[in-house]
Amino acid sequence: MTKRALITGITGQDGSYLAELLLDEGYEVIGMVRRSSTVTFERIAHLQDRIATVNGDLLDQASLIELLRTYRPHEVYNLAAQSFVQTSFSQPVLTGEVTGLGVTRLLDAIRLVDPDIRFYQASSSEMFGKVHEVPQLETTPFHPRSPYGVAKVYGHWITLNYRESYDLFACSGILFNHESPRRGLEFVTRKISHAVAKIKLGQADELRLGNLDAQRDWGFAGDYVEAMWLMLQQDQPDDYVVATGETHSVREFCELAFGRVDLDWEQYVKVDEKFFRPAEVDLLVGSPAKAKRQLDWEPKTSFPELVHMMVDADLALLQGDLDHLAR
């Protein structure tokens, strides 16, 4: 029997890598997109003849019920969200509606249509925010420091609530920062790699950033989607931290990125206070011990490999290599 999977947020970074993985595993893949959305399909352009894209909206439960009834997926991966932390401060209500309540609408649609569907919720390290312990575990208390983090906490707890209340196979992956050449330009890692390529090619002469001392646990998105899939292949539903267990600063990212093209980052990077967050999170670093123990998962891509991959891809992009996103 061919398994069918529904991915919300399929046009995003994680959705595109997850779609590739599921296709390789022999799945039929259905991607949900919003009819009103202005999102680009470039991340899945190389897959579009192998997947079905259908209309649905996390703000509209009737559309979710109809979608589940029509396509009868065995697994649902909820990756759709208003996912940019900075935007969540200017659009807190929309962030709550999509990133928080949208999870409830999807879970309730599953409960009504087919409670045997296995559900994955994309939780986030931003839920920890003002951290209570280092490294962060599945049991670490949440103290979110942005409307995005607050909405993700709601989505996380409602997933657990539906698991316990209705016996749904519902899992949350608490993913720490994960990057790739497909990362949006609004995220600091891609902002850096893209600027490095532009500076190297003579198309820019400086890069303005916020807090260079901000530290994150950065991994490769292509590695992390494997953990999502593995969660739904287990005998019992559970929640897992997905991380590298290492922390690096924005400054380190700059050093490696500029170093890749033989430039001194300090000559080009300018600190601009407008890029500082209203409330900065503390030291986010996750322990992937449980995922390693129970899922037999661990990251394959090192931090320097990730940075170099992103710089190389942006150089290729700016030099007209349109196949860079399929990598």
Where are these predicted regions, by residue range?
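Short, solvent-exposed beta-strand edge segments and adjacent coil->beta transition regions
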Residues: 139, 204, 237-239
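Alpha-helical residues within the helix-turn-helix
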Residues: 293
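Structural signal for conserved beta-strand scaffold positions within catalytic alpha/beta enzyme cores
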Residues: 46, 55, 172, 211, ...
